A protein has these predicted regions:
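Helix-to-loop junction immediately C-terminal to a conserved catalytic motif
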Residues: 27-65
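Residue-level recognition of the N-termini of beta-strands and the immediately preceding loop/turn
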Residues: 40, 59, 85-88, 135-137, ...
């Protein structure tokens, strides 16, 4: 709800607890093992995430927002791949008041419909970055649930934080793409891809609004490229470009179904298409997967 002029801005700070976050991550891992066949990441993606654990300084990870599971993916990645870092993420304050325990895993509440929330959120994140040099901001800059097939269009939140945080030093900004899809298991797969966001080319005289616009554009471009590259791999239904983060064991289907497949000389896992066919398909569509590291190919 938009506040009236003179009304105090509604904001709810987090009270981050590393101990509770680690405990909650155990619950999250069990949830993923129960509800999904596996969690896979495109090869090289986890290396990009893990590099943050070896770097002193804050970081920003911007992800698409298509599911209730998205923040739990962040918990899974944050606790398993970058355990030395602390974490924070914005959330609609009305929802956070319903799930107050989430404040202890780094969630803070903002009023998304109040334009004053943007500078307040930016100020809060920068202050936290100053207090905690290994802090990571996870943010869904689309600002609402959107289907993975929709073109990614961003609100300025992530760009505003990146522009402010990078005024005096360069910090890593990553794009995380997530898809939930069914292949051949009775349960869905979680598929991930990570790509670096290249800093915009800005001169020393750029205004703050120009910096925000430039950063928003670069994050949006990287997220679109990343989502498109992941979508191509999802449609190919080939597990070879992926590495397993969680689950992914053979024989995940029903035992009788697995037996039937073995009798037919097949197996329960996704059969990889020939690499030549995949490459030809991408070439015909004029699609070149974006590099994981974000460097020019």
């Amino acid at each position: 709800v938009t506040t009236r002029p003179g009304e105090q801005l509604d904001f709810l700070d987090s009270v981050y607890s590393p101990k509770l976050t680690r405990g909650f991550s155990i619950v999250v891992r069990r949830m993923f093992r129960k509800q999904f066949a596996s969690v896979h990441a495109v090869k090289g993606s986890l290396d990009v995430i893990r590099s943050l654990d070896r770097r002193l300084g804050p970081a920003i990870i911007a992800l698409n927002h298509s599911s209730w599971w998205d923040p739990l993916v962040c918990v899974l990645l944050g606790t398993s791949e970058i355990p030395s870092r602390t974490h924070m993420a914005p959330m609609d304050i009305a929802q956070l008041r319903r799930f107050k325990f989430m404040r202890k895993i780094g969630i803070f509440g903002v009023s998304p419909d109040d334009p004053r929330s943007l500078p307040r959120m930016t100020r809060h994140v920068i202050e936290r970055f100053g207090r905690e040099p290994m802090c990571t901001l996870w943010i869904t800059p689309q600002g609402e649930f959107r289907d993975v097939r929709d073109e990614i269009v961003l609100r300025p939140g992530a760009g505003a934080v990146a522009a402010r945080a990078c005024e005096k030093r360069e910090i890593p900004v990553l794009a995380l793409a997530i898809e939930y899809t069914f292949w051949e298991d009775k349960r869905p797969e979680v598929l991930l891809r990570v790509q670096r966001v290249q800093p915009p080319d800005l001169n020393d005289h750029a205004t703050r609004s120009e910096r925000i616009e430039a950063w928003t554009g670069e994050i949006e471009r990287a997220m679109r490229e990343n989502q498109s590259s992941l979508a191509q791999l999802v449609m190919e239904r080939d597990p070879r470009p992926f590495e397993i983060l969680l689950g992914g064991k053979e024989g995940a289907n029903h035992p009788l179904y697995d037996l039937w497949l073995r009798l037919r000389g097949k197996h329960g896992r996704i059969r990889a298409r020939k690499a030549e066919k995949a490459a030809a398909s991408l070439s015909q569509k004029g699609v070149s997967p974006a590099p994981i590291g974000g460097e020019p190919s």
